[in-house]
């Protein structure tokens, strides 16, 4: 588990809040920026398809993620879209050839 992921889990445990599933899609023409955006998103969710992530985020995590992404985006060239899914919509997601979106839970013993 990366340090960023550990920090996100520690933060989540501390705030003990509700999360929302976000489907995050990005279109970044520059290879270096695209790689950086991909690395940032890997610390917050699951890479499901090329340029597409599923992330279960609290409000604070969403703000943190957007802030980190904004540091690397060129507004006139890059696009990142956040699609929130309600709990009922997550349950109704249909997949072919892959697992449905589920929140990874961390249990500390």
Residue map of PLM features:
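Basic nucleic-acid-binding interfaces
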Residues: 2-4, 8-23, 29-109
């Amino acid at each position: 588990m990366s340090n960023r992921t550990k920090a996100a889990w520690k933060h989540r445990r501390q705030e003990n809040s509700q999360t929302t599933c976000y489907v995050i899609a990005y279109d970044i023409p520059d290879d270096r920026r695209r790689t950086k955006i991909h690395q940032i998103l890997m610390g917050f969710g699951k890479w499901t398809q090329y340029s597409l992530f599923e992330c279960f985020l609290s409000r604070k995590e969403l703000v943190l993620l957007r802030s980190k992404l904004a540091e690397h985006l060129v507004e006139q060239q890059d696009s990142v879209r956040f699609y929130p899914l309600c709990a009922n919509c997550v349950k109704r997601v249909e997949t072919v050839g892959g697992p449905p979106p589920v929140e990874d839970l961390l249990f500390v013993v």
